Amino acid sequence: MAMTGRARSMGFSILQKALSSAQRSNAHRSILCPTLSNSELLRNYATASASKEQKIKVPLTMYGVSGNYASALYLAAVKSNTLEKVESELYDLVEASKKSPTFSQFMRDPSVPVDTRVNAIKEICAQAKFGDTTQNFLLILAENGRLKHIDRIVKRFKELTMAHRGEVKATVTTVIPLPADEEKELKATLQEMVGQGKSVQIEQKIDPTILGGLVVEFGQKVFDMSIRTRARQMERFLREPLNF
């Protein structure tokens, strides 16, 4: 059977209230998160819990806006020993945004005032009982207009947490869900490739356009064994001129 994600949901009935509530004062906002450059915010956030701790490094090198924020969050979560909790909370948040058009639009609407965004995030975090690490991170995103990047940031963060646990993701695309025995066999084959010390995690995707067979994306490699690709290869072969 296809691997399905967890279906946890959260209530966001307070969102409308937050959006219509009075804006906070500038003084309040400056206390919550003083005006700093993005690099300063990320640096301060990532090192806030590091007094005299040993230096922690991210397991993967990340680039771009989403990569920088994901790396900063990873460092903060590891130092506060809340990595799994933060990962779970962000998963819940992203899933909730997928199920709520209003919340999703709020996250991506640049016209929403900063104060309104921050108030909404604070109330959402309180209702969902998110921990301090997650809440502080979301407030930074809200302050800097980066909530629209939350999906990409969480995806990059997931890559870091998997690397932290020694997990390697293999994406398997098929027309119908892969039977359990075939998934187990495929996982065993991939596990032999990565060797000991790492664990293969299979993510299944359904794509009827490949017509049949399967496509396996594993690390930097792609094994395309789909009927669609085979048909295209056969078509190219048949179009080639015959030389006798």
UniProtKB/Swiss-Prot annotation:
Residues 1-45 form a transit peptide. It is found in: Mitochondrion; Mitochondrion inner membrane. Gene3D superfamilies: N-terminal domain of the delta subunit of the F1F0-ATP synthase. Its main location: mitochondrion. SUPFAM superfamilies: N-terminal domain of the delta subunit of the F1F0-ATP synthase. GO terms for cellular component: mitochondrial inner membrane. InterPro entries: ATP_synth_OSCP/delta_N_sf, ATPase_OSCP/d_CS, ATPase_OSCP/dsu. Keywords: ATP synthesis, Hydrogen ion transport, Ion transport, Membrane, Mitochondrion, Mitochondrion inner membrane, Transit peptide, Transport. One of its GO terms (molecular function) is proton-transporting ATP synthase activity, rotational mechanism. Mitochondrial membrane ATP synthase (F(1)F(0) ATP synthase or Complex V) produces ATP from ADP in the presence of a proton gradient across the membrane which is generated by electron transport complexes of the respiratory chain. F-type ATPases consist of two structural domains, F(1) - containing the extramembraneous catalytic core and F(0) - containing the membrane proton channel, linked together by a central stalk and a peripheral stalk. During catalysis, ATP synthesis in the catalytic domain of F(1) is coupled via a rotary mechanism of the central stalk subunits to proton translocation. NCBIfam families: ATP_synt_delta. This is ATP synthase subunit O, mitochondrial.
